Amino acid sequence: MMRTHYCGQVTEILENQQVTVSGWVHRRRDHGGVIFIDLRDREGLVQVVVNPDNAEMFAIAERVRSEYVLKVEGKVCARTPETINPKMNTGKIEIVAESLEVLSSAEPIPFQLDDKHISEEVRLTYRYLDLRREEMQSTMRTRYRVTRSMRRYLDDNGFMDMETPILTKSTPEGARDYLVPSRTHPNKFFALPQSPQLFKQLLMMSGFDRYYQITRCFRDEDLRADRQPEFTQLDIETSFMTEEEVMNMMEGLTKTIFREGVDVNFEDDFPRMTYAEAIEKYGIDRPDLRIPLQLVDVADLLQDIDFKVFAGPAKDPMGRVAALRVPQGGKLSRKEIDDYTKYVGIYGAKGLAYIKVNDLSAGLDGLQSPIVKFFPDQAMEIMQRVGAEDGDIVFFGADNAKIVNEALGALRCKIGEDLDMIEKEWAPVWVVDFPMFEMDEKTAKMTAIHHPFTQPKATTEEILNHDEPHQMLSRAYDLVINGIEVGGGSVRIHDTHMQAAVLKMLGISDEDAQEKFGFLLNALKYGCPPHAGMAFGLDRLVMLMAKRDSIRDVIAFPKTQSAACMLTDAPGNVDNTQLADLELRFRKSLVAKDAS
């Protein structure tokens, strides 16, 4: 028998019993002719004592080093009071070894597992060692508890776990597809799915009513801290349910996985907020409601002043002038304000005007700012509107509305964190009433904010005849927690004429629509139930719940920000025979570039 108990489960209730444990040597110490080994496995550590009276076993223990794999048989004994370790679950006992076997030796490892300052490059290169660390073990257990909780909740609510294809057809979904050449169909390609969106809708048309899947998705896009080329999502679809019913059920799911995954209880219903309100008050559609700061519009007070920096955007229908009051922010130094000015520049802001409120009772004389002189008649009214008090600072953004929203929205979060203004640990919110369409600034084409299968809050005729489609709302909803979008969904289009109208609005011709989505459009003709769904980004959700900084910390074998695997050195080269089988070859310019 390799073991009777996990190391971390050997506690005082097993005192005087014989046990067998197996695991890695976490630490070995010599004390007065006795060898102590901290043995580690998935469940934790246990101290093993090797006495010198068994010369053969003691000699083996002397040769043992960190990360050797051992099997130990022995008796569980109570520690003396002065040697009890209250920080360990097994700290009241130790195993007095009667047999010790080296199952596997280990070369010196490239870093110590308890080192807190290992570079990410080293961690990812030796991921199998990195995953042995207690922090990573804990994170992966959290991920498992979350997925187990998801499955139980959905199973109990009548959902079926069903698989959808990984090799599928390339369809325009916003990001670039990963393409897979077909050997049996020369010059044709499969695509790895960006989501199971169309297949889960087809499952609703097939009568399965409630579907879920924890699935892998693939997007060939630029990476950030919360992006991976391959990622995992909990995908859900339902028939004959309104968005209100879906949101209520998904809220129940969220509360369940937080309770069972990280012991967090959400007692109250999640608040609701429209997209327009989120943008107006927080500058972003995924607001962090833990931070008690809001943007306030002041454009109407500044349209007629001579200061063009403010008056221009105030008069411009596409512009915005907004203020951000920071309570007791008047203590910020000139350098700190300059740093914040550089920060908003990342988002396109050309500067960061401000007013320090020294003494409101003194009127204009109590305001400290180089810009007050440009609007003396409006300054005090602005202070009143934003609720300024003595000791505050009020920042201003004036530009194109998109720039102001992004710059002040980001500044709001940064200041909230810098000044320790976060009021609570968790702040969930549903964001609803998203616009259906938006204009792509690069292509000047209309695009769907969520995806083209989201149902608009409009009839087919209204879609076709709408003068300002970017003002049309959709039946979409996002779940945001602490400023992170953890999931999103919508009611889907279940009428073939409405679907055709939306595709037409997006500039997709009938011919292209049939080429890309013909299978869906045909299915819509044969009795499609009203249906709605949602998807949770599992990696991002676990990152939030485990309080990690990157989703790379919650994925067992992640890619880097350049979409490479440090462990396996993927992507890699393939030989010419494989390319010939696929009837592929590289252009000479690419081969030469790779060789250089």
From Swiss-Prot:
InterPro entries: Aa-tRNA-synt_II (IPR004364), aa-tRNA-synth_II (IPR006195), aa-tRNA-synth_II/BPL/LPL (IPR045864), Asp-tRNA-ligase_1 (IPR004524), Asp-tRNA-ligase_1_N (IPR047089), Asp/Asn-tRNA-synth_IIb (IPR002312), AspRS_core (IPR047090), GAD-like_sf (IPR004115). L-aspartate binds at residues 173, 219, 450, 492. The keyword Cytoplasm applies. ATP binds at residues 219-221, 228, 485, 537-540. GO terms for cellular component: cytoplasm. It catalyses: tRNA(Asx) + L-aspartate + ATP = L-aspartyl-tRNA(Asx) + AMP + diphosphate. Its EC number is 6.1.1.23. It comes from the Bacteria. CDD domains: AspRS_core, EcAspRS_like_N. It is found in: Cytoplasm. Signal peptide: none annotated. GO terms for biological process: aspartyl-tRNA aminoacylation. GO terms for molecular function: aspartate-tRNA ligase activity; aspartate-tRNA(Asn) ligase activity; ATP binding; nucleic acid binding. The record marks 31 as: Important for tRNA non-discrimination. Keywords: Aminoacyl-tRNA synthetase, ATP-binding, Cytoplasm, Ligase, Nucleotide-binding, Protein biosynthesis. The keyword Lyase does not apply. Residues 197-200 are annotated as: Aspartate. Belongs to the class-II aminoacyl-tRNA synthetase family. Type 1 subfamily. Homodimer. HAMAP family: Asp_tRNA_synth_type1 (MF_00044). Aspartyl-tRNA synthetase with relaxed tRNA specificity since it is able to aspartylate not only its cognate tRNA(Asp) but also tRNA(Asn). Reaction proceeds in two steps: L-aspartate is first activated by ATP to form Asp-AMP and then transferred to the acceptor end of tRNA(Asp/Asn). This is Aspartate--tRNA(Asp/Asn) ligase. It comes from Hydrogenovibrio crunogenus (strain DSM 25203 / XCL-2). The gene is aspS.
